[in-house]
From Swiss-Prot:
Record-given protein name: Protein GrpE
GO MF annotation, one: adenyl-nucleotide exchange factor activity
Native species: Bacteroides fragilis (strain ATCC 25285 / DSM 2151 / CCUG 4856 / JCM 11019 / LMG 10263 / NCTC 9343 / Onslow / VPI 2553 / EN-2)
Region: Disordered, residue numbers: 1-41
GO BP: protein folding
């Protein structure tokens, strides 16, 4: 081949390569511009819708978990309350059991005892032990001896003439002992008052 023809052929090949490069570059530029072009209104709405749906699912999941947690809490508190009602007096009952044991021993002893004073002392010990146990649970005896009548703590069931002037308006006798539990009256003392 002639050098001129060779040169022309090479130039043509170069031109073809340049054209191919240009076409490839244009298609790549078009793809890049398509990627960087702003989204259409429809595409924006679709994107916002997907984001909103994802947020809704997330909030729904949180709500369901919180609802289940609250339901479990409510069930647990109902169960605990039922147990408290059922077993609330267990501590008090357990503390009274030794008094019952002492009473059983006293009853057994009374069948064969000949000394009345010993039996009396035993019963007094049991009574004092019982009062001690009650006081540990917050139960206190309402004082009545030589006290003025206080309707918050005392219930006057009878009024009799006072033997002395000093005893007017005061309690002369206690028919039934009253008690408080942690400062609250659980039974008023039934008393006789002088007038």
């Amino acid at each position: 081949m002639d050098p001129k023809e060779k040169k022309t052929k090479q130039e043509e090949e170069l031109k073809v390569d340049d054209i191919q490069d240009t076409v490839e570059g244009q298609s790549q530029n078009e793809e890049a511009t398509e990627a960087t072009e702003p989204l259409t209104a429809e595409e924006k709405l679709e994107k916002e819708l997907k984001e909103a749906q994802a947020q809704i699912e997330d909030q729904k999941d949180k709500y369901l978990r919180l609802s289940a947690e609250f339901d479990n809490y409510r069930k647990r508190t109902v169960k605990e309350k039922a147990e408290l009602i059922l077993n609330g007096g267990e501590k008090s009952i357990k503390s009274i059991l030794p008094v019952i044991d002492d009473m059983e021993r006293a009853l057994t002893t009374m069948e064969t005892a000949t000394d009345v004073n010993a039996v009396k002392e035993g019963v007094e010990l049991i009574y004092n032990k019982f009062l001690s146990i009650l006081s540990q649970d917050g139960v206190k005896v309402i004082e009545t001896k030589d006290q003025p009548l206080d309707t918050d703590y005392h219930e006057a069931i009878a009024v009799i003439p006072a033997p002395t002037e000093e005893q007017k308006g005061k309690i002369l006798d206690c028919v039934q002992t009253g008690y408080t539990l942690n400062g609250k009256v659980i039974r008023h003392a039934k008393v006789v008052v002088g007038e």
